[in-house]
Regions:
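Active-site nucleophile/metal-coordination loop of metallo-enzymes that catalyze phosphate/sulfate
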Residues: 21-23, 41-132, 154-170
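Active-site His/acidic residue clusters
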Residues: 159-170, 230-271, 307-309
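Bacterial Sec-dependent N-terminal signal peptides
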Residues: 1-23
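A contiguous, mid-domain pocket- or channel-lining segment that forms the substrate-recognition surface
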Residues: 117-206
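Non-catalytic, well-ordered alpha-helical segments in soluble enzyme domains
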Residues: 131-140, 347-385, 463-489, 496
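Active-site regions of oxyanion-processing enzymes, predominantly non-cytosolic
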Residues: 139-140, 145-152, 158-161, 215-249, ...
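Secreted, luminal/periplasmic, and some membrane-associated catalytic domains
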Residues: 47, 64, 73, 95-123, ...
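Substrate-binding rim/cap in mid-to-C-terminal beta-strand-loop elements of soluble/periplasmic
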Residues: 322-361, 435-478, 492-498
Length: 498
């Protein structure tokens, strides 16, 4: 009888053990700001062993990963990646957007104070983001035992990925030459951040965002967080969100690989060396099979039109300022009222001055229609679209769905200007070779997405996947609910690997 009871108990324990939710010790998200998908292969032969090559060779790559909304900019990209939602449901309409009579920054929060700095620029939180993130859902699923942190040089790149319930988010403040946070997360910096800042060799006033050493200081801070917080060693699944900002700033200044300088190559080879060191630290702390890692980008980047034209390729610039001045003059003439009909433009999103129109009893629908008619005459534009009528616009589905997915009423503009492929939204002068992003075309929307580590086998798919699929995929692998505002779907080739 005793043997029978023991056997039954053993079987019960075995069944319970096998039924336990299987999760990695740590989830790591790495976002490379303004990384084009083709950088993976353009720089492959120059990458060393153990870094980006390891990721490409050991990971599962979604080679047709696209951003499925506009605008393709940093704040929106980081919010969308981790919420699984575009601006239409997560509310982050751009880096900066208009709400009523004022412009706001996507992370501004005057109700909180900077911690580690007296700068007002550290008064930041994710309160404008209307969706939860991967980390929020992981925290909720573990009764808030999971630790979740975000780190980047750019504040929005640390804050938005980490989510609303994060244990901390740290970003770089050049005025103190170190990482800071806000009272949204904590009242004082942890001792390990204070120590890191004291040991930082970068001088006050120096901006690592514009230099390759910004990559190094970010990964070093990420490693410091990981070790001090014992991420992956707390008996539950933790999460670390890392974003590399220097790749974007340097590309804006000096361009993609197509531009004359070597700055783009320098920063991506620095990334390769530093990510190897970071992988080694992860392996040592939680084991190669102990963490689930994904690397992606918030958006890609367009080759400079000067470079394009030198090689007889398509590219150009749209002088938006001149266009809006001309359209304003045409509207003043048509409606017989002098004034400023547009009060803001953010990228390709144009905001009418609703207060001015109301004060002069001008019908907004009539003004929109007249403005669009004028914009359609501009040779650098394919067309212009009333955001609220985008669903019936005579445009390819590719463009139309991106306009719809990127529109949040009350934060986005009134009209979206559809620029030609590889066109900048300002007048590019001769001799300038920097890059930009923000538009609908594949140069800005085609980004890398590679998974590596826990429960991931090497491979790839060229099936179309979207940025908003990233969060549902990670959540499905973790067996937690997808974020609240999510509109994406799990990537079955990743989730269902056998």
């Amino acid at each position: 009888m005793k043997k029978l009871i023991f056997s039954v108990l053993f079987c019960c324990v075995a069944i319970v053990a096998s039924a336990q939710v299987q999760r990695p010790k740590l989830v790591v998200g790495i976002v490379i700001d303004q990384m084009r998908w083709d950088y993976l292969y353009y720089y492959y032969d120059k990458f060393g062993e153990g870094g980006m090559k390891r990721l490409i060779n050991e990971g599962f790559s979604c080679d047709n990963q696209m951003v499925n909304y506009v605008p393709t900019v940093t704040g929106v990209g980081h919010a969308s990646l981790y919420t699984g939602a575009g601006p239409a449901t997560n509310g982050i309409a751009s880096n900066d957007f208009r709400m009523g009579d004022k412009m706001v920054y996507c992370c501004d929060d005057p109700s909180v104070q900077g911690v580690g700095t007296t700068s007002k620029s550290a008064q930041m939180s994710p309160h404008y983001m209307l969706g939860t993130t991967i980390g929020d859902m992981l925290r909720q699923a573990t009764d808030f035992k999971a630790k979740v942190f975000g780190v980047a040089i750019k504040d929005r790149a640390a804050i938005l990925p980490a989510g609303h319930s994060a244990n901390g988010a740290f970003w770089y403040d050049k005025s103190v030459a170190g990482f800071v946070t806000s009272s949204y997360y904590m009242d004082k910096l942890p001792d390990y951040v204070v120590k890191f800042n004291k040991q930082n060799t970068l001088k006050k006033g120096y901006d690592p965002k514009s230099h390759a050493d910004g990559v190094t200081v970010t990964f070093d801070m990420a490693e410091a967080i990981m070790k001090a917080e014992k991420l992956g060693q707390n008996g539950t699944t933790d999460m670390l969100c890392v974003s590399i900002s220097s790749t974007d700033a340097i590309s804006h200044q000096t361009g993609t690989w197509c531009s004359p300088g070597k700055e783009n190559e320098e920063v991506f080879l620095t990334l390769d060396r530093d990510i190897k060191k970071f992988f080694d630290a992860l392996d040592a702390q939680v084991g190669k099979d102990g963490y689930l890692l994904f690397l992606t980008a918030d958006h890609a980047g367009t080759h400079n039109p000067n470079t394009q034209r030198e090689h007889k390729l398509v590219g150009g610039s749209w002088d938006k300022t001149a266009t809006l001045r001309q359209v304003n003059e045409a509207l003043s003439k048509k409606f017989g009222v002098e004034g400023k009909y547009f009060n803001t433009s953010v990228g390709f999103s144009l905001y009418l001055d609703h207060a001015f129109l109301a004060q002069n009893n001008l019908d907004i629908e009539a003004v929109k229609a007249a403005a669009i008619a004028e914009l359609k005459k501009v040779p650098e534009l394919i067309t212009a679209v009333d955001y609220e009528k985008a669903a019936v616009a005579a445009l390819p589905q590719w463009i139309r769905e991106r306009i719809i997915n990127g529109y949040y009423k009350g934060r986005s503009g009134d009209i979206y200007a559809v620029v030609k492929a590889n066109y900048f939204d300002w007048n590019v002068k001769p001799g300038f070779y920097g890059s930009t992003h923000g538009s609908w075309n594949p140069a800005d929307t085609h980004i890398p997405l590679i998974f590596m580590g826990w429960n991931v086998k090497p491979g790839k798919t060229t099936r179309l996947t979207n940025m908003v699929d990233t969060a549902p995929t990670v959540c499905a692998m973790l067996h937690v609910q997808a974020p609240d505002a999510s509109t994406g779907n799990p990537i079955v080739e990743v989730v269902d690997q056998k």
